Amino acid sequence: MHQELSKTTQDYNQLASKFDELSSIKNQFEQQTIKVQTENQGLQYRLTERDEQIHHLTQERQNLTEKLTALSQELTGLQTTLTEKEKYFSAQQQNFEQSKQQLGVEFQNLANRILDEKSRSFSQSNQTALETLLKPFREQIEGFQKRVNEIHSESVKGNAGLEAEIKKVLEIGLNMSQEASNLTSALKGEKKTLGNWGEVQLERALQLAGLEENVHYRAQAHFKDEQGGRNYPDFVLNLPDEKHLIIDSKMSLVAYESAVNSEDDFERERLLKEHISALKTHINDLHKKDYSNLIGMCSPNFVLMFIAVEPAYIEALKADPALFNYGYERNVIMVSHTTLMPILRTVANLWRIERGNAEAKEIAEKAGEIYNQICLVAERLNKLGNTLSTVSNQYNSTVTALVGQQGLVGKVERFKTLSAKANKTMPDVDLLNNQLDLARLNVLNQENLQ
């Protein structure tokens, strides 16, 4: 009995030892399980972060694709405009050439007819007088031709400029990433440096649109308000009819640059909010300056606030969709390079139309002057024809009185036989048969004036 109890105790101890061993293994397994779960959570967090990065890169690629599509559409539109311009100017040049040739031929024919039919009736003095009459008209024709050639040359230059602008648009699309890289140094600089950088980018956009400084826009122009204070808007865009459009380019992007470089999500979100707050502060400052009511300014009741960095503009609107309306309610329109370029190109087209209208008006006035000169030449030719007809009639009357049946020649012919000194021969004096056909001349004048 004692031996059995001892054996049972021994078995119990062995079982207890086994139980302790199994408990230790269980604890180790549980610890290992917790460690694996912790590692799994870390991997899951990293996987989520990687998915967010992939989503961000996908979104960025989509944005770049949309920009490339927009640039391609703009390129297609510019090419279509170029083709239409070439057709228009070619048709204008052809019309001018045809009009010039037709006028030249018609007046040359008119002059040839008059000169051929009446050449024997004109003395040297009459021919000189006719040349004097036709000289102003010839000078007008030459001036008209010179102006047509100038317009054609300017149209060719305009087409070449349009092609250059298309190439510049492509270069802008291809170099957008490089521009973003070059921005880093400016974003980290002082406020003055950043403001100057924004002005440089805005002026490049103005020049890319085909606008000229001190002609289509002014930088840092001086204006006074009603209290006599001085104001210097960054850029004042001149519009036809002496109107203006104001563009501001001094926008602080320090918070945005910090947000881009931050690796912490919460810090990045905080910095983006600070970026939006800086935008709102600048909007409020522009609203208080009230540029549109400055003395000498004829501008719509809003200011364009140019944000030189496209992603800073996009991220701000994504983070705060109501930001654009916030500026709009305060008469401040936020624009980036992409949204500003169509506005600038519209202004450039307005100036081209204004210039075309001015040239068309000048040509119309010149045509009116030429028409009046033609009428004057026709009137003088008509008067000259009447004068020549009168002179011709007087000449024929004198000839009739001299050599007619009852003329002086018949009466003095016998004097030749009475005097030895009468040794000269009486020349033949004929009547002029080529009288000016005034009716026909009037018909020719009317045909050429139509």
Curated annotation (Swiss-Prot):
Instruction: Give the family this protein belongs to, as stated in its UniProt record.
Output: Belongs to the RmuC family.
A single BP term in Gene Ontology: DNA recombination
Enumerate the InterPro entries for this protein.
DNA_recombination_RmuC (IPR003798)
Its annotated function is as follows: Involved in DNA recombination.
What's the encoding gene here? rmuC
Q: Could you list this entry's UniProt keywords, alphabetically sorted.
A: Coiled coil, DNA recombination
Q: Which residues form a coiled coil?
A: 3-89
* The protein, known as: DNA recombination protein RmuC homolog
| Record has Coiled coil as a keyword | yes
User: Pfam family of this protein, just one?
Assistant: RmuC
Q: PANTHER family per the record?
A: DNA RECOMBINATION PROTEIN RMUC (PTHR30563:SF0)
